[in-house]
């Protein structure tokens, strides 16, 4: 009998211990807790990098063709280049001139077409009869691209106000066929496209 009592008592004690543990765990869940939280949201918007040539007309003569040129002739064309207010400032603006229709006029780097780009601090004064335009500057003329062969990629442009948003540059692009161009340049045709590319300013903390 004694053995049986001990066994029974052991089972009861074990059961009570389990029940007690369960009750203890359940009791933990009934305690209250004070909490406080706060939050904030950050609005993030991206800027705009955008430069634009002027519309056709006196603010963009680049698409006006020149024909019947001979050695020594020059071709002057103007265009405005604008970085509108509200856009981002730029770290650089480059020019790529590529021939979509090619000939020796653009492939001969020495005796083919040469280009130079300058700008006027005010609007260029236009004279001449289309397409033989000429331009004078009543303000200050500044070099943007030194004389070189017409075709080139990612050519660095200097002294541009349009690096800063809200500014416009009054550009003049002048093409010249050197006097050294010989008879092999007769009867040729080239179409040269000019692409201006603006690069975003240096990244910074915002």
Residue ranges of model-derived segments:
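Signature of Gram-negative chaperone-usher
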Residues: 2-15, 29-34, 58, 113-172, ...
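Short, polar/proline-rich extracytoplasmic segments that appear immediately after membrane translocation
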Residues: 2-70, 186-190, 195-206
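Compositionally biased, low-complexity repeat tracts
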Residues: 20-25, 43, 82, 107-108, ...
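Surface-exposed interaction patch
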Residues: 33-35, 77-135
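Intrinsically disordered, low-complexity boundary segments flanking structured domains
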Residues: 35-40, 49, 98-106, 159-163
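Generic structural hydrophobic/aromatic packing signal, biased to beta-strands
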Residues: 44, 51, 95, 115-117, ...
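A generic structural signal for short beta-strands and their flanking turns/coil linkers
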Residues: 47, 58, 75-77, 111
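C-terminal, structured domain-capping segment
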Residues: 70-99, 157-206
């Amino acid at each position: 009998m004694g053995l049986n009592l001990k066994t029974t008592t052991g089972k009861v004690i074990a059961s009570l211990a389990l029940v007690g543990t369960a009750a203890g765990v359940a009791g933990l869940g009934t305690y209250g807790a004070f909490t406080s939280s706060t939050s904030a949201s950050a609005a993030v918007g991206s800027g705009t990098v955008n430069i634009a040539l002027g519309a056709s007309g006196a603010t963009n003569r680049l698409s006006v063709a020149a024909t019947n040129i001979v050695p020594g002739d020059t071709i002057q064309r103007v265009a405005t280049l604008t970085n509108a207010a509200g856009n981002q400032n730029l770290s650089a603006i480059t020019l790529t001139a590529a021939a979509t229709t090619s000939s020796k006029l653009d492939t001969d780097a020495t005796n083919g077409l040469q280009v130079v780009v300058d700008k006027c601090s005010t609007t260029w004064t236009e004279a001449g009869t289309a397409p033989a335009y000429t331009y004078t500057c009543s303000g200050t003329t500044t070099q943007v691209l030194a004389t070189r062969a017409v075709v080139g990629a990612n050519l660095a442009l200097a002294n541009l106000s349009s690096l800063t948003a809200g500014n416009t540059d009054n550009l003049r692009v002048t093409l010249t066929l050197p006097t050294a161009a010989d008879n092999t340049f007769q009867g040729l045709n080239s179409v040269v496209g000019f692409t201006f590319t603006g690069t975003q300013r240096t990244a910074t903390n915002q």
